[in-house]
Curated annotation (Swiss-Prot):
One of its GO terms (biological process) is proteolysis. This is Uncharacterized protein MJ0231. One of its GO terms (molecular function) is metallopeptidase activity. Pfam families: PmbA_TldD_1st (PF01523), PmbA_TldD_2nd (PF19290), PmbA_TldD_3rd (PF19289). InterPro entries: Metalloprtase-TldD/E_C, Metalloprtase-TldD/E_cen_dom, Metalloprtase-TldD/E_N, PmbA, TldD/PmbA_N, TldD/PmbA_sf. One of its GO terms (cellular component) is cytosol. Gene3D superfamilies: PmbA/TldD superfamily. It comes from Methanocaldococcus jannaschii (strain ATCC 43067 / DSM 2661 / JAL-1 / JCM 10045 / NBRC 100440) (Methanococcus jannaschii).
Length: 416
């Protein structure tokens, strides 16, 4: 595919031009209850074009190669004096992004893994509600008039299962760049359901422990957006104007790192061709930085942190890569009493500006002096920014979506 031809068309008309080509191939097999539902295979690809001239930016996209896409972008101009295209730079390629084993993985192996997960659940007297195993291979190439020409290829393997045990439902999933043992997914789902089955209505005030999964669901709608320079500049972040201030407890260090080996959201560059980097956001509770793309950085006379995210159908926007909450030496064994929350429902209703939230807890239990009591679904609410002032990260780190974090202990209240 001659992407360079699109650049030449734009330049001939006096426009700086950028072309993003994205392609992905996915194979999945799913369960409907305990029965194998269907195999699905999908190929998707598309091209996004941006053009710049005289302080105006145009954008258009198509799901096939079409020279007219450049002319369409030229007709969609809007005033934008801050957007620029990236310049050539050195890129660090993170390890563990692409595995040939995923390319060679056939439908029979996917089905075998799915049946393995299902049978583990059935053999342990659980009802299987749904499940799935999939592989994906992705490719992207970005070129522009400044001479940037960068491409990346990555692979993904995912497995998930939803079960019911003794009246309690649970769900477990995992995505990695390479193949992993799917048996653990079923065993973790069973463990979640067993620990929270036959729950009691308990109200509690004290140590609230959020698992990495529950944290990701909650922080995606509260904490993470607050570090976006786009939100800061639009007065949609409580962190505006607080660089250098103590915003959290000294236990809290948060880093955004798009260069981390083997992590799910690492890459050579962001959606604009800017090299990814490691950005310290909070150090020992002190706010150090925000996250930027080129446009938002230019507004403040700064440099992009490599946090532009986009697909071929969208313009760049600021987003975290791997959002890391640093662990401590603390563990659950250090606490005699707490409520452990494995999942939450309703995070999307949180206020991303203030950090206020109220969620329903799921697969949770009360622990005191070695005794575990399952909890019926209760409500947990508060303000995420206030809670992080007394938060204690533990040492059980795992990646859930964009979040790499241990479980974190907060002060809070469960209402039933």
């Amino acid at each position: 595919m001659d992407l360079e031809k699109l650049i030449k068309i734009g330049e001939k008309e006096g426009f700086e031009t950028e072309v993003l080509f994205v392609k992905s191939y996915e194979v999945s097999v799913d369960l409907d209850g305990k029965s194998v539902d269907s195999f699905q295979t999908g190929i998707s690809y598309g091209i996004g074009v941006r053009v710049i001239k005289d302080g105006k930016v145009g954008f258009a996209y198509a799901n096939k190669f079409d020279e007219n896409i450049v002319y369409k972008a030229m007709k969609n101009l809007v005033e934008d004096k801050y957007t620029e295209f990236a310049h050539p730079q050195k890129y660090k390629e993170p390890k563990g992004m692409f595995y040939k084993e995923i390319l060679d993985l056939d439908e029979e192996k996917l089905l075998e893994d799915l049946i393995t997960m299902r049978d583990i659940a059935l053999d342990n007297n659980a009802i299987v509600l749904s499940g799935g195993v999939s592989k994906e291979v992705g490719y992207a190439r970005l070129i522009n008039s400044n001479g940037v020409d960068v491409e990346e290829q990555d692979t993904y393997f995912s497995a998930a299962i939803s079960i019911m045990y003794d009246g309690e439902t649970s769900y477990e999933c995992r995505t990695r760049h390479n193949i992993f043992d799917v048996e653990e997914i079923s065993y973790r789902a069973l463990d979640l359901a067993k620990k929270s089955a036959n729950g009691k209505a308990i109200s509690y005030k004290g140590n609230i422990v959020l698992s990495p999964r529950a944290l990701y669901d909650l922080l995606s709608y509260t904490l993470m957006p607050a570090f976006s320079a786009e939100n800061v500049q639009r007065d949609r972040s409580v962190l505006k104007g607080k660089i250098g201030e103590q915003i959290f407890g000294e236990n809290i260090t948060i880093i955004d790192d798009g260069t981390l080996d083997y992590a799910l959201y690492s890459s050579k560059c962001d959606g604009e061709g800017t090299a990814t980097q490691k950005t310290v956001l909070v150090e020992n509770g002190v706010l150090k930085n925000y996250l930027y793309d080129i446009k938002r950085a230019n507004r403040e006379g700064k440099t992009s942190t490599g946090n532009a995210s986009r697909g071929y159908r969208s313009l760049p926007y600021v987003s975290p890569t791997n959002f890391i909450i640093k662990e401590t030496k603390n563990s659950l064994d250090d606490f005699d009493e707490y409520v452990y929350i494995n999942g939450v429902i309703g995070s999307h209703t949180s206020n991303p500006i203030t950090g206020d939230f109220a969620v329903e807890i799921q697969n949770s239990y009360y622990y005191k002096n070695g005794k575990i009591i399952p909890i019926k679904r209760g409500m947990f609410g508060g303000n995420i920014f206030e809670m992080f002032k007394e938060a204690i990260p533990l040492n059980d780190v795992e990646q859930r979506g964009k979040l790499i974090s241990p479980s974190v202990v907060f002060k809070g209240e469960i209402i039933n």
